[in-house]
Structure formats: structure tokens, C-alpha cells
């Protein structure tokens, strides 16, 4: 470690795919920057830069947080990460889908980006074992722009579904994960084993301080990911897990009419849980009691409603678990919360939304939601245009008046600037077709949220 010049020894081997994890708990001072590097048999890594959280009782003048999500390797290049590496940031929040569990699957993508397709060790298009997940992480982390961004800033990671399998959930009847689009669906023991292997690969390749038991044989005992981080007294961030404990999708596990574009009444069932009972209590109570100037909630999936009349566009988000969302909002409204900042991803879109008890105009605001755009993964505009079925951003904004804006046709990243007075959201489009550190980039949107004033331009 620099600048003190301390040396920390750690080992590695095939049991962790030759990856290294060095936990420096209690060895660093709060609120300061550090440089670090790795040395092995005379070979020295590039120098990395990080910083520790501000200590309790301090009020930083400002925080700048990078927001990214959904970085499918085969759907574009990582020029946005080269730009992110050069930003002045206190941390990067990765809102899930660090990898996608497939490669070269002709059902999903045509080869557009040279050098981005590869076959998994199993020969399958979808990951079916630990070796496949490890190969995916090695491929993604081979990208030089991702390496630069990881070395430039400290990161906070949460996962979504593609670190394991698309639209995954927990099935309480089989005590195993569900994965509606995976060939192991209907085979609970195989899915349970695969989940354990996906979790293991995640801990090997993703630098996150989580509770992990490598010998556990049940996913919920193996890892607990939800946690809280305090940036002094300015922002307390509640990092949630919206995949490991959630109920099956309320309208069924099919596509159109069930997981997408659904109308079933089960969406409002009190039995539908996104968080599970224990995580729900942890979030509801601790966020309500937080003394921080701003209370941050990271949700891998969209928190606010996205509907067209009676049609729910995506039951994989909180709309499929609406009763639990309503219970949280009611509790926070009774507690007088007005400084909530929700950070979300998953939808391959960017948006800003009013957060209020029923999301109706004129209500007192609890806070605002800001969604990070996908880094490379195709957005709904790109996907639905192939089906000649893209209604447009304006249609979705009109159908959902709580939205300040919706952009389903953007790739890039966002920056959140937090001060005691306001939260500012800067949205950047970056051309994913250019494999260069200076890939074209432009500011697409700039908003701020202030309690009592709502969302404003600027």
C-alpha cells in the first residue's frame, strides 16, 4: 500500500481461479486516498487508486458517484469506461449485470462487434458450471478500459440476474432458485448447485465485502450481499439484493403477457416479496431511522411504476411486487422521509422519477429515483424496433406522469453529485460502437432534486 508503503501478503491458487482478495478492514484511515499495486515474483501490476469512506460525524462538501449497469460484452465496446476512469469520483456504484451468463447465443445477438464473441468451456451458449462463469469473468475483465476504471476508483457492487441466469427468483416450494430461460429450469437441485457456483465466481472476480461461506451448500447460507455504507453524515447507502429472496413472477414465467406486458391481479398480492422478510425489515427500519442528510437506496431493478393503463410493462421490476413497495412507501411517508434517493438499473434505459406514496402528481415527495443507462446492452428502443413495436419515449412519459423523463435509446453512464443542499444527476451518452478511449460522448441530461422542490433541470 502507498503512501505508507505497507506490504500485505496474501495467497492464491486454483481453488479461487488464481484470483486474490485482500481485505484491509481496520488497516486504513477513514476519509483519505490510497494508491496500491500487486507484486508477484518480480512482476508488478499497474498502480490502482482508491479512497476510504468519510468517518461518522463529518459532512463532506460533496460526493461524486459514477453509476453504471448492464455491460454485456458482446453488445458493444467499453469506451464509456475509459471516460469513467477519467472522471473525478469518490466511488462507482455498479447496479448489476456485471456479466451476462451467455456468449455467442444466436437467439439473442448477431455478431456486430469484432473480438467480443467467445465460446464457453462447456460448449454451451449459457453458463452451466463454475468453469463457464469463471470464463465469462475472465473475458469481461480482459477489457483494458474496464481494467482502467476498476483501478481508478473504489467500487460498490450489487448483482442483478445475469450474474446467474435471466429473471432469476427464489422458489419457496423447491427451496431453490428459478431461472425461466435456463435449460436447468424445473431441475431444482441442478439450479441450486449452479447458483452456488455463480456466487463463488462472483466473489472471486468482484471486489465486494460481503458475508461469504465457501463451504455452505445452500445459497442463502453461502452469501448475504445486502449491506449499508455511510459517506460521513452526507449519504447513507442501503445496498439491497433484489434477486436472492424474491418470489416467482406474479403472472407466470412466460414472456409477453406474463413477465412483460401483464395484467394479472397477483401483482398486488401481499404474498409477493422482492426482498424476503428479513431484508425487508432491515431496509424498512434502518432507512427510516437513518440520520444522514440523504438516504440512498440501490435497487438493481426499477423501483417506480412503469405502466400503460392497466398493463404492467415489466413484472420483473418492483411493479411485480407492488404491495411490498407500497408498504415501504407508507412506512417512510409516516416517518416524514423526504430525502430518499433511489438508484436503479436493469431496464437498459435512463430515467428520473418522482417517488411519493402513490406516485401521483401533487403528492408530497419522499425523494427521487435515478436510473443508470446500460453501458452496452441494447435498450428497449433497439430491441422493440426489431419487432416494429417501439412506442417511443414520449408515450411512456405521458403514460407515467411521475416520470420526469424516460430514455430507452441510450448507452453510457451517469454521475450523481451529492451536496447537503441537492442531488444532481448527469447522464452521458457514449458511442458503444467505437473501441477507443475517446469514443464520442455527450451530456444527454442534467437534473437536480431538492426536498420541497422536486426534480428540476440544471
Language model segments and positions:
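Metal-dependent phosphoester/phosphodiester hydrolase catalytic core
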Residues: 1-458
Amino acid at each position: 500500500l502507498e503512501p505508507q508503503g505497507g506490504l500485505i501478503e496474501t495467497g492464491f491458487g486454483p481453488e479461487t481461479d488464481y484470483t486474490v482478495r485482500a481485505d484491509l478492514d481496520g488497516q486504513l484511515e477513514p476519509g483519505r486516498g490510497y494508491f496500491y499495486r500487486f507484486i508477484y515474483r518480480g512482476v508488478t501490476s499497474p498502480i490502482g487508486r482508491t479512497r476510504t469512506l468519510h468517518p461518522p460525524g463529518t459532512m463532506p462538501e460533496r460526493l461524486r458517484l459514477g453509476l453504471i449497469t448492464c455491460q454485456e460484452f458482446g453488445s458493444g465496446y467499453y469506451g464509456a469506461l475509459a471516460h469513467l476512469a477519467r472522471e473525478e469520483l469518490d466511488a462507482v456504484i455498479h447496479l448489476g449485470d456485471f456479466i451476462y451468463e451467455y456468449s455467442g447465443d444466436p437467439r439473442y445477438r448477431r455478431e456486430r462487434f469484432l473480438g467480443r464473441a467467445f465460446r464457453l468451456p462447456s460448449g454451451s451458449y449459457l453458463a452451466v458450471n463454475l468453469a463457464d462463469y469463471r470464463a465469462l469473468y475472465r473475458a469481461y475483465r480482459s477489457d483494458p478500459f474496464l481494467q482502467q476504471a476498476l483501478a481508478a476508483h473504489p467500487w460498490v457492487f450489487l448483482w442483478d440476474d445475469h450474474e446467474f441466469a435471466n429473471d432469476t427468483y427464489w422458489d419457496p416450494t423447491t427451496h431453490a432458485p428459478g431461472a425461466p430461460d435456463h435449460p436447468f429450469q424445473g431441475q431444482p437441485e441442478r439450479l441450486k448447485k449452479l447458483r452456488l457456483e455463480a456466487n463463488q465466481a462472483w466473489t472471486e472476480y468482484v471486489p465486494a465485502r460481503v458475508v461469504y461461506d465457501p463451504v455452505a451448500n445452500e445459497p442463502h447460507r453461502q452469501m448475504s450481499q445486502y449491506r449499508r455504507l455511510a459517506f460521513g453524515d452526507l449519504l447513507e447507502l442501503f445496498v439491497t439484493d433484489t434477486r436472492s429472496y424474491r418470489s416467482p413472477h406474479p403472472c407466470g414465467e412466460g414472456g409477453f403477457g406474463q413477465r412483460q406486458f401483464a395484467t394479472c391481479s397477483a401483482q398486488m398480492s401481499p404474498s409477493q416479496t422482492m426482498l424476503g422478510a428479513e431484508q425487508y425489515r432491515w431496509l424498512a427500519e434502518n432507512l427510516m431511522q437513518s440520520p444522514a442528510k440523504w438516504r440512498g437506496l440501490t435497487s438493481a431493478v426499477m423501483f417506480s411504476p412503469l405502466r400503460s393503463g392497466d398493463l404492467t410493462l415489466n413484472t420483473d421490476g418492483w411493479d411485480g411486487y407492488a404491495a411490498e413497495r407500497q408498504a415501504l412507501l407508507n412506512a417512510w411517508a409516516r416517518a416524514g422521509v423526504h430525502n430518499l434517493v433511489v438508484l436503479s438499473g436493469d431496464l437498459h434505459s435512463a430515467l428520473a422519477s418522482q417517488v411519493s406514496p402513490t406516485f401521483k402528481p401533487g403528492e408530497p415527495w419522499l425523494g427521487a429515483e435515478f436510473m443508470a443507462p446500460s453501458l452496452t446492452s441494447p435498450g428497449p428502443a433497439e430491441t422493440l424496433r426489431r419487432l416494429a413495436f417501439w412506442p417511443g419515449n414520449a408515450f411512456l412519459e405521458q403514460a407515467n406522469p411521475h416520470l420526469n423523463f424516460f430514455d430507452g435509446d441510450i448507452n453510457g453512464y451517469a454521475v450523481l453529485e451529492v451536496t447537503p443542499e441537492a442531488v444532481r444527476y448527469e447522464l452521458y451518452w457514449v458511442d458503444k460502437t467505437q473501441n477507443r478511449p475517446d469514443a464520442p460522448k455527450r451530456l444527454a441530461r442534467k437534473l437536480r432534486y431538492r426536498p420541497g422542490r422536486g426534480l428540476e433541470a440544471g
